[in-house]
Amino acid sequence: MVKYALALSLVAGAVAALPAAPGVNSQAPPSLPNANPAAIMSVPQSNVKSYQTGGLVRYNVTESSGLSKRWGCSASPTLTWGDADNGGPGITIDNDSNDWRGFYFYHNSCDSIPWKYIWIAGKTTQFVSVPTGWAGRVQRGVDASMLNGQPQLLGSWLEISWDAANGNTGWADVSLIRGNDGGILVWNANGDWKGFTQWVLDGAPEGAYDMKNDGQWVIKYTENNDGSINTIPRDWDIQKIGSQYVYVDDAHGSPVISTPNQRFSTFWPDGRA
């Protein structure tokens, strides 16, 4: 009965979360070249320059409320369909879904309202620019949840920051500490990469799941606000992905990469938004 109810919830959540295509007036630029994730991931991790943290400015759930915010939190988000590439910092997002998908940028410690968001057509890639020194995360989602003024922390995070004091060097990782709603792959121009693309959201043991506000069942967060570990989802992430590729918690692995040219590329297989 539990499995039957879970299946019904998954179907209902998936239907509720399907986005409406923006349509011909979206003003989306032509797609950039799409990625070849198999080629990117063919580079062995022994050849990848990795860091446990490096210069990455990360969101810390146990300290966030006490931090002075480097940015003013947004009162309303900025919608883009794809930014002009003027040579500054930013990331490309390759949406591998067959349909439009939404991606939401949050400043660190600003959880209620995204700073910027973008809808990208299926099988296309767009560039999103960020200011010098930007630090935050990107999540997949839908407007009904991500733009409702409430924090939506549950899910996979692309954590990214740029160090303005050191040539605006970029740092990035994929974190599953606040949950896992699907794969993210991130890489730099040197071929260093982290993240995963395989589907890992089905078949996890009891205690590994949590429900997003839109009804989607995803892998639960691995760390609580007090820093204690939820071992069932953490161990599932280790088993299916590995701590050398993602943050499964704050104690394992070296899943951070850096870029000297202010740019990261990302590939997003379909998940549960």
PLM segments and residue spans:
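Extracellular low-complexity, O-glycosylation-prone Ser/Thr/Pro/Gly-rich "stalks"
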Residues: 18-273
